[in-house]
């Protein structure tokens, strides 16, 4: 099968690391793969994505060549293009309309490009926003099937979701919450399918219940960009509670983002600079290597539901931590309970520093409980989130 994957920026930039295992699985399974990023900008951050570069069609979002090809395609198929434009003009507000119009020329260019090379058998977009807009336009012009993976923020945006669901073969949602939202927005049931994201799990087993030296601080990692939805502010308050009660703990914050400075100020004001480190942006391969090497005793994700409804999907960072045998503490928000249930992690209410502190104290002091939790977590990820299981199921949906 010849598959075109449309991404936001992968293999470029630091985001969309979760797409890499699925694209590589399709390639290793013998399928012909091309990747088309909307914006082919930035450095190649993730080592695993280097292998995808030779299969990437790198073009800007807009250029004279793309505009020229779009005009030629419009002249060639004026009725089809007009129908697509009418559909695009159903966008529910001006912002979304402008976003869709911005990608329209590249979608027409892509159709023309494939017609001059090899037309794919299927187009699959990651995100049901503008990536799916390109997929819908290109697939319509080429008269081939297409599908999309929907996540969380892109669903909340509601960029022509009803129209896209009606037009595509299927919508793959990464969790039940997202699937229910799209069913409500589209009125469709049969096309909406839940298939979790898959992570690449090494064959070797982690050393569950690693023994740490009591005199050393309990080492905790929080992986996540500094955004309101991640709930950093509540975790810092929880760390202060633990330190005030004599706990020996050190927190590593991995990531960047607009709220980093305010979190740094919070750490300084609470006199926690000796107990909290800012690691910056870690590459995906570096993060995985350190997880499997036992660099951290626990991974925590204190995510919240923001005032505008932003929330977590099923965080890949938690899947990978659980696969590596690292105990997890998280909040019961978004899609997290789908992953972290039935004794696989400690879940606490959102925006509750005291509950976070109590959960972290449990992980620090109850080794036997942590080992049981880590074993159950690894089984959960192996059975339900392994790319070796998810990869073939996604490809089967496309055929």
Predicted regions: what they are:
Residues 292-310, 326:
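Acidic donor-binding loop of glycosyltransferase active sites
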Residues 177, 198:
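Carbohydrate-associated surface elements
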Residues 301, 318, 323, 327-330:
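Short hydrophobic beta-strand element within catalytic cores of glycosyltransferases
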Residues 261-286, 293, 297:
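Nucleotide-activated donor-binding/catalytic signature segment of Leloir-type glycosyltransferases, i.e.
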Residues 1-64, 115-118, 144:
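N-terminal subdomain of nucleotide-sugar transferases
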Residues 17, 218, 222-241, 247, ...:
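A conserved mid-protein helix/loop that constitutes part of the nucleotide-sugar donor-binding site
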Residues 339-353, 362-368:
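Conserved acidic donor-binding segment of nucleotide-sugar-dependent glycosyltransferases
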Residues 275, 355, 362, 369-384, ...:
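A short, well-ordered alpha-helix in the C-terminal region of glycosyltransferases
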């Amino acid at each position: 099968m010849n598959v075109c994957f449309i991404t936001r920026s992968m293999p470029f930039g630091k985001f969309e690391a979760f797409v890499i295992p699925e694209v590589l699985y399709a390639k290793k399974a013998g399928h012909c793969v091309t990747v088309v990023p909307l914006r082919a900008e930035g450095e190649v951050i993730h080592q695993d994505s280097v292998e995808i570069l030779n299969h990437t069609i790198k073009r800007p979002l807009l250029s004279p060549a793309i505009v020229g090809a779009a005009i030629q395609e419009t002249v060639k198929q004026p009725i089809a293009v007009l129908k697509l434009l009418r559909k695009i003009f159903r966008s529910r507000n001006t912002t979304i309309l402008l976003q869709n119009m911005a990608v329209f020329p590249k979608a027409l260019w892509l159709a023309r490009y494939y017609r001059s090379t090899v037309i794919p058998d299927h187009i699959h977009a990651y995100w049901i926003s503008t990536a799916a807009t390109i997929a819908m336009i290109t697939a319509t012009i080429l008269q081939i099937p297409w599908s999309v993976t929907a996540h969380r923020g892109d669903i909340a945006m509601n960029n022509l979701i009803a129209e896209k669901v009606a037009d595509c073969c299927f919508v793959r949602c990464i969790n039940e919450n997202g699937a229910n939202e799209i069913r409500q927005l589209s009125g469709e049931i049969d096309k909406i399918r839940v298939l979790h994201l898959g992570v690449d799990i090494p064959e070797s087993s982690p050393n569950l219940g690693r023994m740490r030296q009591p005199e050393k601080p309990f080492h905790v990692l929080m992986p996540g960009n500094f955004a309101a939805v991640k709930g950093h502010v509540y975790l810092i308050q929880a760390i202060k509670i633990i330190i005030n009660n004599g706990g020996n703990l050190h927190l590593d914050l991995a990531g960047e983002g607009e709220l980093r400075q305010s979190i740094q100020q919070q750490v300084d004001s609470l006199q926690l600079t000796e107990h909290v480190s800012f690691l910056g942006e870690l590459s995906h391969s570096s993060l995985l290597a350190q997880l499997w090497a036992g660099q951290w005793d626990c991974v925590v994700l204190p995510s919240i539901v923001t005032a505008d409804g932003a929330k977590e999907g099923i965080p890949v960072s938690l899947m990978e931590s659980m696969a590596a045998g690292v105990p997890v503490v998280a909040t019961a928000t978004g899609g997290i309970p789908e992953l972290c249930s039935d004794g696989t992690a400690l879940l606490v209410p959102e925006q509750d520093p005291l509950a976070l502190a109590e959960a972290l104290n449990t992980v620090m002091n109850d080794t036997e409980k942590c080992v049981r939790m880590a074993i159950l977590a690894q089984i959960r990820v192996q059975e339900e989130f392994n790319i070796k299981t998810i990869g073939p199921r996604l490809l089967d949906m496309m055929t």
